[in-house]
């Protein structure tokens, strides 16, 4: 089944209207000038319709702030009837569901940004991505932003696990949805891939702020710098198309609605224009899981080829040739190296600043180890002529 390209979304240049009460929702004139001159992300649809509340939610005591937001968003709900559910799978932010009906048909998710995550995530860009994906039918409703987070619609369905995403009927749906997102246009601009910009920024943070306290299990900064240069030199030559990517498609970011027979992706903090092969390779790495990482679960070649065939045929609307599938297979596995490196750097930064209960240092070491383990084999993959 072909996935038709999405029409470009009309936009105005850096659509944001200044609201003095909430600095998160504003751009200064200087920021607009800088963004216009060297924009890593094409602007999305106008954001004027999204309320921004001057409310800060305490990370350690979310409920009072969440209820203040609910009074604004659902004034007809009686406070004593509001139920809550805490989601604890996230390792970047804290998430609370607020609802009154048992079936959670009308449910507001309150997401509180993790400490210091502005070092890792462009929050204005996240909101642009949210609205861009919503405009193309790929995201839930965004209800509001507040000083340190946002509220949005709860998507019905179940978050998948590593055991689910390797099932053929489900990975076909995932491939189709990714193909759909990858067809979102860049509003007439020629987008740059975010990968190198973000990776260099993360590396600079690690080098300048964190390196003196690094564990002996982490490669030395000089080694990381060499590997980053090697990645950029080799992967930039692969001619992977730059498309709109999710960039963080771990299992729990995939919601399966069995009633409607589709999947949707959630959490757009890292979304943006990037290499097609990075998005797919990153997802394949996530077959290993996050809390209990096991790279024995990395998809076998046969599974990858079938997944990639579904993806290409959805994107093209015609049958994919064996050469096309093999070419994408080589690109994807090479870019999966960059995914290991990217999230290892990310984890080192999180280890320094995050208050989430997760062993980020251990995770960084696991990702670096896997990078160096598979690098020789992946580097030897030849691109089909």
Swiss-Prot record:
Identification of the protein by name: Ethanolamine kinase 2
Indicate the enzyme's highest-level EC class.
transferase
Catalytic activity from the UniProt record:
ethanolamine + ATP = phosphoethanolamine + ADP + H(+)
Q: According to its UniProt entry, what is the function of this protein?
A: Highly specific for ethanolamine phosphorylation. Does not have choline kinase activity.
**What are the TM regions of this chain, as residue ranges?**
none
Q: Which family does it belong to?
A: Belongs to the choline/ethanolamine kinase family.
Which Pfam families does this one have?
Choline_kinase
Q: Give one GO molecular function term.
A: ATP binding
* Pathway, per record: Phospholipid metabolism; phosphatidylethanolamine biosynthesis; phosphatidylethanolamine from ethanolamine: step 1/3
What keywords would UniProt list here? Answer: ATP-binding, Kinase, Lipid biosynthesis, Lipid metabolism, Nucleotide-binding, Phospholipid biosynthesis, Phospholipid metabolism, Transferase
Give the E.C. number(s). Answer: 2.7.1.82
* Superkingdom of this protein's organism: Eukaryota
Q: Which InterPro entries match?
A: Kinase-like_dom_sf (IPR011009)
Record-linked Gene3D superfamilies: 3.90.1200.10, Phosphorylase Kinase, domain 1 (3.30.200.20)
Q: Which GO terms describe its cellular component?
A: cytoplasm
List, in alphabetical order, the GO biological process terms annotated in this UniProt record.
Answer: in utero embryonic development; multicellular organism growth; phosphatidylethanolamine biosynthetic process; placenta development; post-embryonic development
